[in-house]
């Protein structure tokens, strides 16, 4: 499994729209679901810092994720620009695999 984590600081006036767009049934998840190797998205709200969220995007493999992005780069960029105004900041925390899964 391959997991990508993103951290967001959300504009308070846009929070409901953000949750709808970035949640497990939101537009990002629907976009990624075109790939059979996409396993799902979780949206976590920070209990200690209001307006801060994490997304966890799960894929079968790094290759599946990279391949999807390569094939759909312009659509990804268009969707990213569309939702840019919902956040005050967006940080890619990292990409992770299951420990011990390789070799």
Q: Could you say what each language-model-derived stretch is?
A:
Residues 17, 23-40, 58-93:
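An amphipathic, aromatic/His-enriched active-site/gating alpha helix that lines ligand/cofactor pockets
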Residues 8, 15-16:
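N-terminal presequence-like segments and adjacent domain-start helices
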Residues 97-103:
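Short, low-order "capping/linker" segments at domain edges
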Residues 2-9, 40-71:
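Short, well-ordered beta-strand segments in beta-rich or mixed alpha/beta enzyme
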Residues 7, 95-97:
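Short amphipathic
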